[in-house]
Amino acid sequence: VISYGLAAVLSLFLAEVKEEGKERMSVKAFCGSLRQTFTDKRLFLLLLGVAFLNETHQTVTVFLNQLLYVRAGMSNALIGYLYIVVTIVGMSCIFSAAVTKKTGRVFLIRACYLTAAAVCLLLAFGRNGWGAAMGIMVLRFAFSLFAPLQTQLQNERIMMVERATALSINAVIIDSVGVGTNLIYGALAEKSLTAALVSGAALCAVGLVFIERGMKYV
């Protein structure tokens, strides 16, 4: 995770072959986008809220899920089949626009965050293997509906012409937050899987507060 974060940061400084004038404009645009991101507290809260749900979903559905399955006594073959099913559930992102249109943006965001928090709590204190599998699928489904919406929220918040640069900076910030949350999850999981999952529920709750405060100004 740390290597991915460092790679994302370093990629921003890769030099491209272009005319000197255009290069100076690109550097100026980058610095302007960077300054705007760190001085816009509302945008920063929005990115923090997005990062908390992103990383909780990633950690629980990719790493902690295996510990949950093993704790429930599932075989390696069954774990592999469940991984395939969860991957297929991730394709539900194609329904995000339709669901958002019917329920409204705010309702869907709240539902996704609260569902993620509830799933983390159920996984933390549950011991049933199939219950864990269903929880993982529900978490993947909720995040898949939210994923396209978070991109839309970021786009609406960007005020600069260099939209691609601003989105890249947003991605770096989200990934950097992810490095910190993954260190927390890893440290807690080594001591207690329950503690790691409870912290995931807490981050989802805090993330909802952050993203709602950021959305008020989108």
Summary of predicted features, one role per range:
Residues 7-26, 213-218:
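Helix-loop junctions on the cytosolic side of multi-pass membrane transporters
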